[in-house]
UniProtKB/Swiss-Prot annotation:
Plays a role in pre-mRNA splicing as a core component of the spliceosomal U1, U2, U4 and U5 small nuclear ribonucleoproteins (snRNPs), the building blocks of the spliceosome. Component of both the pre-catalytic spliceosome B complex and activated spliceosome C complexes. Is also a component of the minor U12 spliceosome. It is found in: Cytoplasm, Cytosol; Nucleus. It comes from Dictyostelium discoideum. It holds the Pfam family LSM. This is Probable small nuclear ribonucleoprotein G. Its main location: cytoplasm. Keywords: Cytoplasm, mRNA processing, mRNA splicing, Nucleus, Ribonucleoprotein, RNA-binding, Spliceosome. Gene3D superfamilies: 2.30.30.100. GO terms for biological process: mRNA splicing, via spliceosome. Residues 6-78 form the Sm domain. SUPFAM superfamilies: Sm-like ribonucleoproteins (SSF50182). One of its GO terms (cellular component) is P granule. It comes from the Eukaryota. Belongs to the snRNP Sm proteins family.
Length: 85
């Protein structure tokens, strides 16, 4: 790890996985990760905005700016692969 240098996000293990994304403004969306860039902007497909446990809205394909993401949580199980350096 190098201090002072920002590393690119490594979200490749989350590609094609269903995620819960918490956004600023107290918004939450669930969707399947289709892509990302170095600024952690993400593309989600089959996206659903979760307003409450009983209120959900299907919004389809979306692009979310990285600076509005507070938390990303996988909703599917993932295989653990140790990082090699």
């Amino acid at each position: 790890m190098t201090f002072g240098k920002q590393a690119d996000p490594d979200l490749t293990k989350l590609l094609d996985k269903k995620l819960a994304i918490k956004l600023n403004g107290n918004r939450t969306v669930h969707g399947i990760l289709r892509g990302f860039d170095t600024f952690m902007n993400i593309a989600l497909k089959d996206t659903v905005e979760v307003v409450s446990p009983t209120e959900k809205y299907e919004i389809g394909m979306v692009i979310i700016r990285g600076n509005s993401i507070l938390l990303m949580e996988p909703l599917e199980s993932m295989a653990y692969v140790p990082k090699t350096e």
